[in-house]
Design a protein with these regions (language model features):
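Glycan-recognition surfaces
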Residues: 243, 292-401
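Strand-loop-strand motifs at the edges of beta-sheets in extracellular beta-sandwich domains
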Residues: 81-97
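C-terminal edge beta-strand
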Residues: 31-33, 112-123
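C-terminal beta-strand-rich structural cap/linker in extracellular carbohydrate-active enzymes
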Residues: 491-514
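Carbohydrate-binding surface patches
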Residues: 383, 389-392, 397-399, 434-474, ...
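Aromatic-lined carbohydrate-binding/catalytic grooves of carbohydrate-active enzymes
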Residues: 138, 152, 156-268
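Solvent-exposed, low-complexity, repeat-rich "mucin-like" stalks and linkers
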Residues: 25-28, 43-70
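A short beta-strand micro-motif common to beta-rich folds, especially ectodomain repeats
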Residues: 63, 99-111
Length: 514
């Protein structure tokens, strides 16, 4: 009897353990917290209103558009050398016609149509609005593969993220061969007889992979370090910068994250010249190419990179890794965001302060390079996170599991009115106009003369917060729209007050009442 009892207790313990593990691995259902309205069945064209390309560079742009498919796309005013695909909604080609080309895009389906003015700026600048897309690091780490990248591209289309402007599908570290590894899949000869870098066994054909990503109208990104090795110990670009740049272009990549890592062993000193040097070299090599590659500087904010980053790149990390930020009473993204917000005057079209990726949905513990688990952030903290990044004109690069995107996470990532704040062509980053232990307020001037404002709660309970017009340099009656709910909430004079949940946000847009 005792043996049977022990056996039954063991079974119960195992079942409890399995149930507990199952509970831990199931994302909480936050559907009751969804704020973003579903898009209409009729077409709605989203995304930036301006896009940069260099003369004669290949151009690929997938028109972001929600609405029931099929949708037909009609594009007028394209420069010579460019054309559009009516069924796919892709704009492709190349042109040597420098200047700003005003293009009218019309999208039609059985429910209606939408028209959108889109400017193609042919010149020297790329990334005229902050890049949007996905990066593999915080979910796949050293497990990344060709198959995972293709799946991410598939999911960017299937989930609708592409219809809101997400376009880059970026590999982070660990695609090369690893130094001193005995694993035949990732170790071995790191460069061929011509010194061309060799991907590891998980990436059998880079050209086939980028072709697959491009076939969906999306763009492909890559990662490497200017040092001898990457942060995870894989082959770096040291001494092969020009060759690597040409190789990445021949593989048809569109984005490069260039991570300081082991370059610290090569820098002569801590002078500004030495901090700039590796990025200046790669920037120069990329600019020689006949392909546009956006350059993301990753060197953790050293030597006030925000003061010189625009000279040698398109966006630059202003802090250490967000995934390694421990946080405290407030989640880590607040601390990273506060630091990034200080540099608002130095953001501009073509050059953006980068506070790191959006870590919601399923993400892996960066300290352990672990498998993904549901984010510990509350729903209101996730709204605050996305609001802060959009107000700061940050690159919107999601780095969670693309295969486990639930409706709540998509509602945070895919609100076109919130994203429009990030993608505003004026390119101004929000500034902090108030910050104390209870709350802080960000305000961003928009190209149409309105202001986007975020009122953030820093306390652990719901609280009524206000913002006065004098804090925002406003006078008189002002119309206010709730951006998350996409709803006009009235006309206010001198002050706006609202109840905000713990660690939550009220993100609004304000226009004069005339």
């Amino acid at each position: 009897m005792k043996r049977v009892t022990t056996y039954l207790l063991a079974i119960i313990f195992v079942l409890i353990s399995i149930h507990s593990k199952s509970q831990q691995l199931n994302a909480p259902d936050y559907s009751d917290y969804i704020l973003t309205p579903a898009p209409p069945l009729s077409p709605r064209i989203n995304g930036p209103s301006i896009y940069g390309v260099r003369p004669d560079s290949p151009f690929l742009y997938r028109i972001p558009c929600t609405g029931e498919r099929p949708i037909n796309f009609y594009v007028e005013g394209l420069p010579a050398g460019m054309s559009s695909d009516e069924k796919k909604g892709f704009i492709t080609g190349s042109t040597d016609a420098k200047g700003i080309h005003k293009v009218i895009i019309t999208a039609k389906n059985k429910h209606g149509k939408d028209t959108f003015e889109f400017k193609i700026m042919v010149g020297d600048k790329l990334a005229l609005t902050p890049p949007m897309g996905w990066n593999s690091w915080y979910i796949h780490y050293d497990r990344i593969s060709d198959a995972t990248m293709r799946e991410a591209a598939d999911q960017m289309i299937a989930t609708g993220m592409a219809e809101y402007g997400y376009q880059y599908v970026n590999i982070d570290d660990c695609w090369m061969r690893k130094l001193d590894s005995k694993d035949p899949g990732i170790g071995g000869k790191r460069r061929d007889e011509n010194n061309v870098i060799i991907p590891n066994g998980r990436f059998p054909d880079m050209n086939a992979m980028t072709e697959y990503i491009h076939s969906k109208g999306l763009k492909a990104g890559l990662y490497i370090s200017p040092g001898p090795s990457t942060c995870a110990g894989y082959e770096g670009s040291w001494g092969n910068e020009a060759l690597d740049a040409r190789t990445f272009a021949s593989w048809e990549f569109d984005f490069l994250k260039y991570d300081w890592c082991s370059y610290r062993k090569k820098a002569k000193d801590k002078s500004r010249e030495e901090y700039i040097k590796p990025y200046k070299i790669m920037w120069g090599e990329l600019n020689k190419l006949d392909r546009d590659i956006v350059l993301n500087l990753c060197q953790y904010g050293m030597d006030n990179v925000w003061e010189w980053g625009a000279e040698v790149g398109n966006c630059w990390r202003t802090t250490g890794d967000l995934g390694l930020e421990r946080g405290g009473d407030l989640p880590g993204f607040y601390h990273i965001g506060f630091s990034n917000a200080e540099h608002w005057q130095l953001a501009q079209p073509g050059g953006w302060n980068d506070p790191d990726y959006i870590l919601i949905g399923w993400v892996g513990n960066a300290h352990e390079m672990a498998e993904g688990t549901p984010t510990a952030l509350t729903p209101h903290e996730q709204y605050s996170y996305m609001s802060m990044w959009c107000l700061m004109a940050a690159p919107l690069i999601f780095s969670g599991d693309m295969a486990k995107l639930d409706n709540f996470t998509l509602n945070v990532l895919c609100n076109h009115e919130v994203i429009a704040v990030d993608q505003d062509p004026l390119g101004q980053q929000a500034r902090i106009v108030r910050k104390n232990d209870r709350d802080f307020v960000l305000v961003k001037d928009m190209s149409d003369g309105s202001k986007a404002v975020g009122i953030f709660s820093l306390v652990n309970q719901a609280v009524k917060l206000s913002v006065k017009w004098k804090e925002l340099s406003l006078k008189g009656d002002q119309q206010i729209r709730d951006l998350w709910r996409q709803k006009d909430i009235g006309t206010y004079d001198k002050i706006y007050s609202t109840e905000i949940p713990a660690h939550g946000v009220s993100m609004i847009r304000i226009w004069p009442d005339n």
